[in-house]
């Protein structure tokens, strides 16, 4: 099928990761996946949540938000509603647990790294772009800790990236933009490590059910996209 932006069914949108985007953060990136743009920062704080007290371990957590005009129609800020909306809450928990999967919390020591993901322009795949960009910010924050002598070795034990796949007009597509996502019969987000292991699969039959064969095809498609994303992460992390 001819996609909205001219891509093939198996093609990612263009990916750009710009490191050190925010001056004061220990790690930061601007990630662009097509027209979706997210600023991801990693901030180190010498404290841990109460449930980690005396554990000898650190913590990695995340917050997610979207600028009011990141979308075609202005959205209210969560603060104006005096509560975090359910979608933002779900996404930030997803980001946090995805990153904790590849961090040795004992090596991190009793400190917290907070990941802030701020969507400045949304065109589908904001949660997957947030995870992919946050990984790079997290690595840079941990490198800062090593350089300062606050930890002896890198606590990051692997790589994590995420992408979306779906079925639109009966065809399996990689990396859905907003128009495709809003018209998908099946929508799926996939998070994997560089070892090929799954962290999370979120699959929903939005307008129809799907078969085991289709599930396998979507997972294979996601795997190919994540392989490309991990390559892009490594290229920016090791170019200097």
UniProtKB/Swiss-Prot annotation:
Phosphate binds at residues 87, 125-127. Signal peptide: none annotated. Keywords: Nucleotidyltransferase, RNA-binding, rRNA processing, Transferase, tRNA processing, tRNA-binding. It is an enzyme of class 2 (transferase). One of its GO terms (molecular function) is 3'-5'-RNA exonuclease activity. Belongs to the RNase PH family. PANTHER family: EXOSOME COMPLEX COMPONENT, EXOSOME COMPLEX COMPONENT RRP41. Homohexameric ring arranged as a trimer of dimers. Phosphorolytic 3'-5' exoribonuclease that plays an important role in tRNA 3'-end maturation. Removes nucleotide residues following the 3'-CCA terminus of tRNAs; can also add nucleotides to the ends of RNA molecules by using nucleoside diphosphates as substrates, but this may not be physiologically important. Probably plays a role in initiation of 16S rRNA degradation (leading to ribosome degradation) during starvation. This is Ribonuclease PH.
